[in-house]
């Protein structure tokens, strides 16, 4: 969908015409940033204001599958202002429940949480706080507790560290290969996402 009009306007049309995949509860958006020293994906950057633990688990698994299609091995961190149970925040409890659900549905997925953003990207810090963490190395799929935190984190990283080089957003949960561009999309990103849609369409044939 084009870079004119709002994201949710396009999403409404997609929902009416294409709909969600069988069994999918919700849509979500994943953006990938090509930073100097790492490639990082963030979800959800555009859709869910206050997702449930079940919805977060669903689109975490979907985002990991999308990364594998791009030949990226997902290493997932569930983010919160709570750090492995150190805080009493609602987002921390929600992300801990999401972790349980993801481990039930995709036991092969390398994932841990809930954790601060610095712990997700700094293994030494993470292991100092939780030596038994099941996540090794740097996380490359950052799952945020709501769309506000996801969108803010994405735009800050894109501008300050990513040189405005980004891929996405990838729409997760739709019953066809379809993506929604944002008003800040460059020509390069439009071409990239058109190519991604073709790759996704070929994959489901």
List PLM regions with ranges.
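Anion-binding alpha/beta catalytic cores of soluble intermediary-metabolism enzymes, centered on
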Residues: 1-136, 140-205
């Amino acid at each position: 969908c084009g870079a004119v009009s709002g994201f949710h306007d396009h999403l409404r049309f997609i929902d009416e015409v294409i709909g969600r995949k069988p069994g999918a509860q919700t849509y979500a958006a994943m953006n990938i940033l090509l930073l100097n020293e790492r490639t990082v994906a963030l979800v959800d950057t555009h859709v869910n204001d206050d997702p449930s633990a079940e919805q977060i688990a669903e689109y975490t698994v979907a985002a990991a599958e999308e990364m594998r299609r791009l030949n990226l091995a997902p290493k997932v961190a569930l983010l919160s202002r709570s750090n492995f149970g150190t805080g009493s925040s609602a987002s921390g409890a929600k992300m801990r429940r999401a972790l349980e659900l993801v481990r039930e549905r995709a036991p092969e997925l390398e994932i841990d949480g809930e954790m601060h953003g610095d712990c997700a990207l700094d293994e030494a810090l993470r292991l100092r706080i939780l030596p038994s963490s099941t996540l090794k190395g740097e996380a490359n799929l950052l799952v945020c507790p709501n769309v506000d935190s996801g969108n803010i984190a994405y735009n800050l990283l894109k501008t300050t560290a990513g040189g405005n080089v980004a891929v996405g957003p990838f729409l997760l949960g739709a019953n066809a290969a379809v993506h929604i561009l944002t008003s800040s999309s460059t020509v390069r990103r439009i071409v990239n996402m058109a190519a991604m849609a073709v790759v996704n369409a070929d994959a489901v044939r």
